[in-house]
Amino acid sequence: MKRNKTNRCLVVVVTVVFMLCPSLSGLYAQDPLPPIPRVLEPLHLPGQTKEMHSSGRLIVCHDSLPDNFKHTADNVIEDSTRSLLPFFRKLNEMNGPVRVVHIGDSHVRGHVYPLVTRRRLESDFGAEAVYPDSITYRTDGLAHETGEPGLVYHIMGVNGATCVTFTTEDKIKKIAALQPDLVILSFGTNEAHSRRYLAPAHEMQIDRLLSMLKKACPETVFLLTTPPGAYVGRRRSRVINPRTVTVARIIREYACKHGMAVWDMYTVVGGKTDACKNWTRNHLLRADGIHFTPEGYRLQGNLLHQALIKAYNEYVATGLE
């Protein structure tokens, strides 16, 4: 009897260990993460649903930011020239595959953040254009097309990348071969991490990449995004990266100057004063102060989806003119 009780206790202990420490097996995102992330206290999300009512095919859009995120901004895409109009028109008509290519650094390479956006957009506009797949950190992020109408969302991230990383003939050819209708560019974290960062050089690097992409993909439209924020320094003396605010500003100014769309995630989640504090307060930032937990990346993916759908609904509500 005593031995049976002991065995039962051991089973319970082992079970609890594996429930609390799923990192004992597998990989999930860009760094060794569990296949099922550790359980965090659920984020308190606002319950209100934002829905636009008008003629045309509008998509229901839910708020994504936790209530306790401080000094946030409206989660919208800035696009004063309506440069994304051709992409949204194709989404609305859906006469064939509509292709998105999302390029960027390790935040994109981890697949969690862009994959959430992809799955939600597939739910909105149809997943018939791609074969069912299971994307993990060990797989690539490319979708496999069926030829049917629907959304196709390709993910191309490189750990440690800056926008310069993609200014090679090989990478430009790979992007162009996917025939994107929209390219999303998510860089800035690694630019900001360099102590030798210079804003004029950064602007030139963005311009070089976009010039190469425009030449290779003349019918494509572009969406720039700003980084989510990060810390720098050793763990005991870590501080909020002071260069991120400049990096985000350069990306915004470049987009404005060249009539391009920009999603300013950095400002949306709290900007200079609170972005990093908001991530940390909700246990969404990993111990390195740069990368995020799976739940943190899922929130970013939901935010990007929300911003895209808000912009899409606006175009539909105004007659796509």
Kindly label every feature range from the protein language model:
Residues M1-R38, E321:
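Bacterial Sec-dependent N-terminal signal peptides
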Residues L27, P227-E321:
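Catalytic His-Asp segment of secreted/periplasmic serine-dependent ester chemistry enzymes
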Residues Q30-S80, T136, D140-G141, N282-E321:
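Conserved catalytic region of serine esterases and O-acyltransferases that act on ester linkages
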Residues I36, G110-V112, A192-A199, Y231-R236, ...:
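Extracytoplasmic/secreted cell-surface and envelope-processing proteins
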Residues E78-L91, D140, V164-A176, M204-M212, ...:
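Alpha-helical scaffolding within the catalytic cores
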Residues R99-H102, H107-M204, R208:
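Conserved SGNH/GDSL esterase-like catalytic core that processes O-acyl groups on lipids
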Residues H111, L115-R119, K173, P200, ...:
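Solvent-exposed, polar/charged alpha-helical surfaces in well-ordered, non-transmembrane soluble domains
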Residues I184-G188, I206-L210, K214, V221-T226, ...:
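Conserved, well-ordered alpha-helix/loop/beta-strand core segments that scaffold catalytic motifs
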